[in-house]
UniProtKB/Swiss-Prot annotation:
Name this protein carries in UniProt: Two-pore potassium channel 5
UniProt cross-references to Gene3D superfamilies, sorted A to Z: 1.10.287.70
Tissue localization of expression: Expressed in hydathodes and the vascular tissues of roots, stems, leaves and flowers.
UniProt comment concerning the protein's domains: Each of the two pore-forming region (also called P-domain or P-loop) is enclosed by two transmembrane segments (2P/4TM) and contains the GYGD signature motif which seems to be involved in potassium selectivity.
Gene name for this UniProt entry: TPK5
Subcellular localization, as worded in the UniProt entry: Vacuole membrane
Family membership noted in the UniProt record: Belongs to the two pore domain potassium channel (TC 1.A.1.7) family.
Amino acid sequence: MEPLISPQPRFRLQPIPENPSSSSSSASITIPRSISNTSFFHEISQERLLLHHQDLEQSVQDDKEDQDSDSDETNRFLSQTRPLHRSRTAPAMVIIKDLRTKPPETKKPSPVSKSIIRQAIFLLIVYLTLGVSIYSFNRDHYSGIETHPVVDALYFCIVTMCTIGYGDIAPLTPWTKIFAVVFVLFGFGFLDILLSGVVNYVLDLQESMILTGIQTRQHHQHHHHHRFSAKDYIIDFEKGRMRIRMKVCLALCVVVLCIGVGALVLHFVEELGFVDSVYLSVMSVTTVGYGDRAFKTLQGRLFAAVWLLVSTLAVARAFLYLAEARIDRRHRKAVKLALNREITVDDLLKADTYQHGFISKSEYIVLKLKEMGKITQKDIDQVVIQFEKLDPNQIGKITLPDLLGDPL
């Protein structure tokens, strides 16, 4: 039988005896220790791991060298100063500036209101000057108790312009009657509108001053927690204006004040009784003017020239605020009903503008705004026309180049 050969090729091949006991008898043959297959593959794997680890170290070192070279090139590139050109598709700096949040500002009267005040004062002076001049040169053509020509003329002009019509001073001749007709129409139709603009300006100025004072105090106390207080009944902080009911209360207080002041003057100057003083004061403020009572003294007519002008406008403003409050209350009810009403199939079909079988959030908002009465289809059509003007390419979008006038 042939002897077994060791499978490990890197060792010198030596014969392995078949019987181990015969090793003692043969001294010329040396028998090495046999190596198993497990230890053989284990040594090979260790060598491979060692080689792989060396390769990894070499690759890491190469990467570091590449990074160093790239950083050197980048530094050399940055060291060379080059002008940066702004892309034409980048947002304009004006638009970016406008996108910054701005603190809320208190609404202030516009310069247009100031111009209306100047026009109203100028026309009022012209109106009164013309009336006083014509009355002064034609005193014999008017009936009534005379005190002073200028005072009587001013009193007559104010009573005519405010449409009170006491009847204590009235024209007698056709010429003075024609003048009275023109004077009434001109004063009632034009100057009264301008004076109402003056009242609006004064009230808006007062409102802005109140809002500014309250907002200033809140700015100093911003670290405190907001609690519901009496100021919330006066100011609508979300809309930045006084509440309607507060405006009505202020207007009514002004009316009561005018009635009280007029009654006191009538009682002490015209020497009327308490009931007659209040009666004439109310009839004058409300522009009823039965004519059974009127101002007869010089001091009373001077007072009436200023008091009637202020009080009649205050009463008109109070009635306007009352009407505004009723309309606002009606709108709130309509909004509440529109929000609580569930949408129907007909509503979905009407609101589905693009016939998709569903409505989006914007379409739902438009539907509810229509139900609330805040917008109409005419308003939507006007907005659509404006949108089409801003979208010259008719792509259904307004892009930045369209606004800047620089199409791509």
